[in-house]
UniProtKB/Swiss-Prot annotation:
Protein name (database record): Male-specific protein scotti
Keyword Flavoprotein attached: no
Organism, as annotated: Drosophila virilis (Fruit fly)
InterPro entries: Soti
Domain of life: Eukaryota
Example GO biological process: sperm individualization
Cited function: Post-meiotically transcribed gene that has a role in late spermiogenesis; required for actin cone progression during spermatid individualization.
Keywords: Developmental protein, Differentiation, Spermatogenesis
Family: Belongs to the male-specific scotti family.
Location of the region described as Disordered in the Swiss-Prot/TrEMBL record: 24-43
Residue stretches of biased makeup (Acidic residues): 30-42
Keyword presence, Isomerase: no
Length: 158
């Protein structure tokens, strides 16, 4: 005698719900599929859990909305496991003729320092420091620079 799935409606009284319709009820041997492997009990429990969840969703729409919501943010671990090899952009080759060179600006100097520097150029290199100091002392007077005109008015001009 072939045992198959018995399809009949059974009304179960649950405390949360008035009546529940269940399909694929297990027959005499304990599982509903008739092959004797025993996985029918798990299916029966899963079906009851689904029925109870459906009843809870109907009673409480906020819970249903939370249960149906997707995971935020989506979990995608395979992107984090391996580094992504992005081909590098080839560097632009530049001609040495088109590369601009910095323009060297002469520092801002007052007239006294400029004149002293010009006067020092004709002196031997080992005596230039002493000559420059003597030049500043000799020429920094009111006759050469009346009312302080041409003298440094701030530290940056030295």
């Amino acid at each position: 005698m072939e045992q198959g799935v018995v399809e009949e409606l059974i009304h179960l009284q649950l405390p949360e719900v008035e009546a529940v319709d269940v399909v694929n009820v297990p027959d005499g041997n304990g599982d509903g599929d008739g092959d004797g492997d025993g996985d029918g009990n798990d299916a029966w429990e899963r079906q009851l859990d689904e029925v109870q969840m459906q009843a809870m969703r109907l009673e409480n729409p906020q819970v249903a909305m939370l249960l149906d919501a997707p995971h935020e943010p989506p979990i995608e671990l395979h992107h984090m496991l391996e580094p992504v090899n992005v081909p590098q952009r080839p560097r632009k080759k530049r001609s040495f003729l088109t590369i601009s060179k910095p323009f060297h600006v002469q520092p801002e100097r007052c007239a006294l320092i400029s004149n002293g520097w010009r006067a020092v150029q004709c002196v031997q290199p080992e005596k230039r420091g002493e000559y420059f100091a003597n030049y500043l002392i000799k020429h920094m007077n009111s006759r050469n620079y009346p009312n302080g005109e041409g003298l440094p008015n701030r530290w940056g001009q030295f």
